[in-house]
Amino acid sequence: MKTEKITVNELFSGIGAQISALERLGIPFEIKHTSDIDHNAVLAYASIHCGLTEELINTYAEYPTREEMARQLTEINLGYDFQKNKPYNWYRFVNSKSKELEKYWLANKLSRNLGDISKLEHLDYADFWTYSFPCQSVSVSGKQEGIIKGKTRSGLLYEVQRLLEKADKMLALPKYLMLENVKNLVGKKFKPQFDEWVAWLDELGYNTYWKVLNAKDYGVPQNRERVFVISVRKDIDDGKFEFPQPFDNGVRLKDALEDKVDEKYYLSEDIQNRLIITDKTLTKNVIGTTKPSFRTIGRRDSVYSENSIMGTLVATDYKQPKQILETNRCVKVGDLNYYPYETSNRIYSKEGISPTLTTMQGGNTEPKIAEPIVAVIEPDVKSFRVRKLTPKECYRLMGFTDEQFDRSQAFSSDSQLYKQAGNSIVVDVLYYIFGKLFEVDTETRKEIEC
């Protein structure tokens, strides 16, 4: 095991998935700098990793003037709105009774956030740079404008290139680089640009290894395919790096669900009555129906398991969860004929794998699951309630602990928590990748930590 301290520059840092993985591995590290303009993500990062609390905000004694705090946050483009192409107005808090300026300024200071990467002249040396740039312009769910310098969010990759070129001139190239992005980055449309990037890294002095990995193969019940790119400086590379082998530890969506959920996360009866059973691949054991006055469940309302594997959410016997766990797939049990977007209407079984989490931010776009309830009139019959995943469950599905979630929740709304989770990287996948990169034993941990 390599035990020497690793210094890190965490670009596009989000809520700190990378350092969460390093912490979990027990690797000593020091964050030199982070870089992000999402002010709410910076707030979450500082609360999760840097000890930011309401008490600290109220007792901290070294704040500059409010005018100076507003100037500093504006200068680094914290909170900049790229859709509207306008900076965040920090000056509106100068005469406010609230401590909004103090809160965000202190979060920025504690997380050592440099803000807008395009405004940076250079980065201090660090052994390890992470640079998981925005995916909006290459994602299949986006406009796919591409990686265009100065014009698209994904074009910020070229700011990383500029900073690496500056580091090269300063004889301060990092030993390791890590990039995570959507699978489409290595798809047909964008693979030529990706190959150009890898070739450029080769010329700069790096050997690069990349692979598409799915979170469901690394201990987290979420079907999330992402490309991971590891670059190692040639003068230290022994050529032995390999990506971790996939495994199935049996963890499923139900293992990440909360025991008790606030009623606000359940869909209304009117919407639930629009449920349409659609998974015709299932072959045995009914798992749901929306008919309010049924006495027996008809065949047309039935949902069955695939490939002769028995379904788990069964009307007459709910003690068969492992029978559908074997499918290791995202089990869609039905559709809601209600929302304008097809993916928002999907209903998933909690015995399967979660769909990929996106930035969501509420608005009924959160993944929805079916839960069994016992009918009062006929105790031997079960129906289903449909609800959204909670923010805590989304954090769990990204590999964050409940303690980390609680720290973030202290400063974040539900919509921000959904966004933070969807924007992040699955910690468990990073855990196993970094274990290989830094030669740390990962065999003792094979299950999700909630």
Each predicted region: which residue ranges?
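Core alpha/beta nucleotide-donor-binding catalytic domains of modification enzymes
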Residues: 2-173, 183-188, 192-195, 202
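Short alpha-helical segments and helix-capping/turn motifs at coil-helix boundaries
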Residues: 96-100, 113-117, 213-215, 296-299, ...
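A structural signal for short, well-ordered beta-strand segments and their strand-loop junctions
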Residues: 130, 178-179, 209-212
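Alpha/beta-hydrolase-fold catalytic nucleophile elbow
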Residues: 132, 180, 230
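Short beta-strands and strand-loop turn motifs
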Residues: 176-182, 411
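Short strand-loop junctions, especially beta-strand C-caps/beta-turns
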Residues: 181-184, 216
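Conserved S-adenosyl-L-methionine
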Residues: 205-217
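Class I SAM-dependent DNA methyltransferase catalytic core
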Residues: 215-217, 222-228, 232-450
